[in-house]
Amino acid sequence: MDEHRKNVLLVNDLPCYGKVALNAVGPVLSAMGFELYRLPTAIFSNTLNYDFAEAADMTEYMRRALAAWQTRGVSFSGVCTGYLHTPQQAELILSLLQRQTSAFVMVDPVMADGGAFYRGLGESTAQAMRTLAAH
């Protein structure tokens, strides 16, 4: 297998407390021999099932990291998305997928629990997820 064929991009939030999102999927894929690129969409003080979580939006960082990887010529055999903090983040991933046409794509539309959107998310996020999932 070519070295670039083992690169997987993980796009998800990073809770500083909790065993979900980037904290969960990374170790499994790493143990399977994949080279992982982690692209955090937001950094949270804790998981969103608590009454309060401090959040840092990572949209601008995502833009810069994707540009840096493009400059290096990094290609991905797989792209796995989870929680997206803004609809603009879906646009960034769609732009990447237009360049990386052979990547296997898995979209997990993490945006709600119990029929209610997570704080700060809404219909625009749902539409962005629909567009991304249809790719």
Regions found by a protein language model. Name each.
Residues 58-61, 85, 89:
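Soluble or luminal CAZymes and related metallo-dependent hydrolases
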Residues 12, 83-84:
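Conserved residues at beta->alpha junctions
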Residues 81, 87-135:
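Conserved beta-alpha-beta core of the PfkB/ribokinase-like small-molecule kinase fold
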Residues 1-78:
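Small-residue (G/A/S/T)-rich helix-start motifs and N-terminal tracts that mark the onset
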